């Protein structure tokens, strides 16, 4: 419950930052004189048992009073719950003071939760790093193997290449055959590594779920959704990476095959192929394949960092004073910022609802 409260206070700070606090209190003031509107809002938002619903604003204020009273032990000092003023402006000022006081006491909890969740997400990144490192090592190794396997023009074959049309055409046709054969084999060798990456993502993200649960400010339901979303995103990105590597191989095969066909066609027309051009072309194409694939693997690694950082902000945002706290909400008069703030408030409502529901069930189970 402390984690949920901390998140609530953080978002109230964001309210002030994006200049929406006044509209919130205007709405609250109007609602104070309209009990039927309060009842409608409660019917739309509250999903716990009907017996726990309070239909009057006076009871809501009483609950707020008890809520503030329960915060007293956090400072180690018991105190009487403050009386709430009847005028909305006085209520606004008093609640602001209470929130500022409570936020100051709870910020250490929020900072610790943010740090703990971040540490667990960093653990996930460390666990996935060997998969990408292994993939890059395999790319480098397979490129070297391809270069050896496609080395059809050596000291012993230069004379064959220059010996006549038939010899040159036969050598270039052999190159075409080798290109198709060995690039296909490399594609098959990459598949198990890509599959291990996908499997590793699923396993390590589930381990993350268990390790981060005690520290997250989110409800268990929202935590599960965040973890499932992270697993799905990373899995899709890993599958897309495998598809791009295969596309790189297909392009390499097509380019080398086209070069060999062009050389064979020139040989038939009587042109003698340059013995140095063929190995140079093979080497350049292989280096381009290696370079492009390395960049794509690096992009995938950065995507892991980005997705895990986003999850950290969702599950355990930093304290309001932290530079990473809700940076997208600092754009005043921005419809996008208001939309994101609304989404976070809806998440907050779900967390509070689940926490109160769980507390209610625990009280019912007490003898």
UniProtKB/Swiss-Prot annotation:
Residues spanning the signal sequence: 1-20
Region (Disordered): 71-90
Residues bearing PTM Phosphoserine: 56
Record key words, sorted: Chylomicron, Coiled coil, Endosome, Golgi apparatus, HDL, Lipid transport, Phosphoprotein, Secreted, Signal, Transport, VLDL
Main location: secreted
GO molecular function: cholesterol transfer activity; phosphatidylcholine-sterol O-acyltransferase activator activity; phospholipid binding
InterPro entries attached to this UniProt entry: ApoA_E, Apolipoprotein_A1/A4/E
Highest taxon in the source lineage: Eukaryota
One GO process term, biological-process aspect: phospholipid efflux
Gene Ontology CC annotations of this record: chylomicron; early endosome; extracellular vesicle; Golgi apparatus; high-density lipoprotein particle; late endosome; very-low-density lipoprotein particle
Posttranslational modification: Phosphorylated by FAM20C in the extracellular medium.
UniProt function note: Minor apolipoprotein mainly associated with HDL and to a lesser extent with VLDL. May also be associated with chylomicrons. Important determinant of plasma triglyceride (TG) levels by both being a potent stimulator of apo-CII lipoprotein lipase (LPL) TG hydrolysis and an inhibitor of the hepatic VLDL-TG production rate (without affecting the VLDL-apoB production rate). Activates poorly lecithin:cholesterol acyltransferase (LCAT) and does not enhance efflux of cholesterol from macrophages. Binds heparin.
Record note on quaternary structure: Interacts with GPIHBP1. Interacts with SORL1; this interaction leads to APOA5 internalization and sorting either to lysosomes and degradation, or to the trans-Golgi network.
Protein name in the entry: Apolipoprotein A-V
Source organism of this protein record: Mirounga angustirostris
Native organism taxonomy: Eukaryota, Metazoa, Chordata, Craniata, Vertebrata
């Amino acid at each position: 419950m402390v984690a949920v409260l901390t998140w609530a206070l953080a978002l109230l700070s964001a309210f002030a930052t994006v200049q929406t606090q006044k509209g919130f209190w205007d709405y609250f003031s109007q609602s104070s004189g309209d009990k039927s509107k309060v009842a409608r809002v409660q019917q739309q938002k509250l999903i716990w048992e009907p017996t726990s619903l309070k239909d009057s604003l006076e009871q809501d204020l009483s609950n707020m009073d008890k809520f503030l009273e329960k915060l007293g032990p956090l400072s180690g000092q018991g105190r009487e719950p403050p009386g709430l003023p009847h005028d909305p402006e006085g209520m606004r000022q008093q609640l602001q003071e209470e929130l500022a006081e409570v936020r100051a006491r709870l910020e250490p909890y929020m900072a610790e939760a943010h740090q703990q969740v971040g540490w667990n997400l960093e653990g996930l990144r460390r666990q996935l790093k060997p998969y990408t490192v292994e993939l890059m090592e395999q790319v480098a190794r397979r490129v070297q193997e391809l270069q050896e396997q496609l080395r059809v023009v050596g000291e012993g074959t230069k004379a064959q290449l220059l010996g006549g049309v038939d010899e040159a055409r036969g050598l270039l046709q052999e190159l075409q055959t080798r290109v198709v054969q060995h690039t296909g084999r490399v594609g098959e060798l990459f598949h198990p590594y890509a599959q291990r990456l996908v499997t590793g993502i699923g396993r390590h993200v589930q381990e993350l779920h268990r390790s981060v649960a005690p520290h997250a400010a989110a409800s268990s339901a929202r935590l599960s959704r965040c973890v499932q979303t992270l697993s799905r995103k990373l899995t899709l990105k890993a599958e897309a990476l495998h598809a791009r590597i295969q596309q790189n191989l297909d392009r390499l095969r097509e380019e080398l095959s086209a070069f060999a066909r062009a050389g064979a066609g020139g040989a038939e027309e009587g042109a003698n192929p340059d013995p140095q051009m063929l190995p140079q072309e093979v080497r350049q194409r292989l280096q381009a394949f290696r370079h492009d694939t390395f960049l794509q693997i690096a992009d995938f690694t950065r995507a892991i960092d980005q997705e895990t950082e986003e999850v950290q902000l969702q599950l355990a945002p930093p304290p309001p004073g932290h530079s990473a706290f809700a940076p997208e909400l600092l754009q005043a008069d921005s419809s996008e910022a208001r939309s994101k703030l609304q989404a976070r408030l809806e998440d907050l409502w779900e967390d509070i609802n689940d926490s109160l529901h769980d507390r209610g069930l625990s009280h019912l189970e007490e003898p």
